[in-house]
A protein has these predicted regions:
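Hydrophobic alpha-helical segments and their helix-loop junctions in multi-pass secondary transporters
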Residues: 185-213, 223-243, 402-410, 436-444, ...
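C-terminal membrane-solvent junction of multi-pass transporters and transport-like membrane proteins
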Residues: 351-361, 386-445, 481-484
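Juxtamembrane transmembrane-helix boundary signature
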Residues: 54, 81-114, 122-129, 133
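Loop-to-transmembrane helix boundary motifs in multi-pass membrane proteins
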Residues: 117-118, 154-159, 265, 269, ...
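Extracellular/periplasmic helix-exit of transmembrane alpha-helices
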Residues: 88-102, 246-247, 268-299, 542
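Transmembrane alpha-helical segments of multi-pass small-molecule transport proteins
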Residues: 124-125, 148-169, 186-190, 357-369, ...
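Flexible loop linkers connecting adjacent transmembrane helices
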Residues: 26-32, 66-71, 94-119, 174, ...
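A generic transmembrane alpha-helix motif of multi-pass inner-membrane proteins
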Residues: 221-224, 421-485, 526, 530-533, ...
């Protein structure tokens, strides 16, 4: 559709107007100062939503399984990984919320416009496949919760799918966000379950802040679980979802500060949920035959009913269903947003299905397809779950690299580009994520990978990656010093300029000029992706046909 917004790159006219959040409204064009505490609180309440939804959606069915496995198999010894992931979560999601507020263009479309058709097409297709499989795992979580509650699986799955579809298709953005906020509140059911089990708080406090490895655990298994925690916590769909949702909510640069606060609240909730699941599972199964023998999240609910109380099991099952619902909703939306963005179609929750048919069709088909697969007897759900992990490992490096490059593109972000220290930290994080991605992908393709191989890859890759990132940072500092770019950076723009700067229409942007080193790394990334995809297809085909 045509862009009706002058001097801005916003692709859908529905993305411009009043901010109508679950808890308040901000009029379009309102850039007035918020001087009193009450004014700031009202503004924050209106902005609340994107950060909370994406972070609580991160604690979905897959996260329940991963965190419960960590607690049941290794106690609370891996809690420290959650603390280390806090800055990673914040930096990644802060960059995409900044991209969304400043550009008004979704993540997939920016990749297409700035890096070409290959990368744009790859990102959209890979995201679609990964998200479609992820939504299946959400409905697996729903069936596990229904099973413990004694409710019929077929009717329960159909009702869940219908609820998720209906919530997004009213043509009222505020109504969808209020539905999502209800799910966010229900995610806190994990807290009373945690308190009921009476886990050792002193041990939890120790393991949160003192890194250590489980005694007697096989290093390769522990490392793969740690990588699983990272992959669960830092998922590619989150980047695409939050950027598009910030755009759809009509958040502008004026309110980035408030959206950052929203993100921090979401991170606090995701941390509370993760600690509750790990701590509760560890205390529940300590000294029991089930310790070290994790099955699935449904078995954890059964364990609560067996060793504690039926109420605790019910609350956990309801929390699992709740997490699966918000996960299915957010992941489906991220896909529909991305495809519609790339194909230049209407894509907004402010529109009714009759006014954005393709956008809602993608959303409905993803939900209906996932629900149907779960209900079909004989579908290899375990294979689908492994495929999700593998595809996440394949997509994460490219998503991390593109995010970093886009946040250094001055034509895209203007005065909102990354600072030098943000770049250094983000570069190191991206290097670590790429390294973990390689190990995760390799572990699925070769399940018998040895502990020594993992250690060698971590140490060798960590040293090489650290040297490359630091060297690139030093080279950039020298180049900036020679060109005077560092002096320009020190002359900070005014607050009003920052609050009103938006990316110009895509057609007005100059072609992105990649340095020789950037082009080299893009070629390496393309080669890695080609090899990884071929190996994944081979492995999945082998397992499907031969069963091993």
């Amino acid at each position: 559709m045509t862009n009706n917004v002058k001097n801005e790159a916003v692709l859908d006219s529905a993305h411009v107007g009043d901010i109508r959040g679950a808890f308040g409204t901000i009029r379009h064009g309102d850039v007035a100062a918020r001087n009193s505490v009450w004014q700031r609180l009202r503004t924050l309440l209106a902005i609340l939503g994107p950060g909370l939804i994406v972070m609580v959606g991160d604690n979905d069915a897959g996260a329940f399984s991963t965190y419960a496995q960590a607690g049941q198999n290794y106690g609370t010894s891996l809690l420290w990984t959650l603390i280390l992931l806090i800055p990673v979560l914040y930096v990644n999601q802060e960059m995409v919320l900044r991209l969304g507020a400043v550009t008004g263009v979704g993540h997939a479309r920016l990749i297409l416009e700035r890096f070409g058709k290959f990368w744009g097409t790859f990102s959209a297709i890979d995201l679609f496949l990964l998200n479609a499989l992820t939504i299946v795992t959400e409905f697996i979580g729903i069936t596990l919760g229904l099973q413990y509650l004694g409710l019929p699986k077929e009717w329960g799955v159909i009702a869940a799918a219908g609820l998720v579809m209906a919530a997004a298709s009213t043509g009222d953005f505020r109504r969808f966000e209020r539905f999502s906020m209800i799910l966010v509140v229900f995610s806190l059911l994990l807290v009373p379950v945690f308190m009921m089990v009476h886990p050792p708080m002193s041990q939890i406090g120790h393991d949160l802040f003192v890194p250590g490895m489980p005694a007697g655990g096989k290093l390769s298994d522990v490392m793969l679980l740690i990588i699983g925690i990272v992959g669960t916590t830092v998922a590619p769909w989150q980047l695409f979802f939050q950027q598009s949702y910030v755009i759809d909510k009509r958040i502008t640069p004026r309110f980035i500060k408030y959206e950052r606060a929203d993100l921090w609240l979401g991170i606090v909730l995701v941390l509370i949920g993760a600690v509750a699941i790990i701590g509760m599972s560890a205390a529940l199964f300590a000294g029991k035959p089930e310790f070290g023998n994790f099955q699935d999240a449904g078995a954890v609910a059964a364990g609560l009913g067996k060793y504690h109380s039926h109420l605790a099991g019910v609350l956990f099952a309801v929390a699992l269903i709740d997490a699966s619902l918000i996960g299915a909703s957010a992941v489906s939306l991220s896909t529909a947003y991305a495809l519609a963005d790339v194909l230049n179609m209407k894509h907004s929750l402010h529109r009714k299905p009759s006014d954005a048919r393709a956008f809602y069709l993608v959303y409905f088909l993803l939900i209906a397809g996932a629900a149907s697969l779960v209900l079909i007897p004989g579908v290899p759900l375990g294979l689908l779950t492994n495929a999700v992990q593998t595809l996440a490992g394949v997509l994460l490096p490219s998503a991390s690299v593109f995010l970093l490059l886009l946040c250094n593109d001055k034509d895209v972000l203007g005065p909102w580009v990354n600072g030098r220290w943000t770049n250094l930290f983000t570069g190191l994080v991206a290097a670590v994520l790429v390294l973990l991605s390689v190990i995760l992908t390799a572990s699925v393709l070769w399940p018998d990978i040895s502990s020594q191989t993992i250690v060698n890859v971590l140490v060798g890759g960590g040293i090489v990656g650290g040297i490359v990132v630091i060297a690139a940072h030093v080279v950039k500092l020298r180049r900036d010093a020679e060109t005077g770019a560092d002096l320009a950076e020190e002359a900070k723009p005014t607050k009003l300029y920052m609050h009103t700067w938006r990316m110009p229409p895509l057609a007005q942007l100059k072609p992105m000029a990649l340095s020789r080193s950037n082009r080299m790394w893009m070629a390496v990334l393309r080669g890695y992706l080609v090899v990884a995809v071929i190996m994944v297809v081979y492995k999945v085909t082998q397992v499907a046909l031969l069963g091993h």
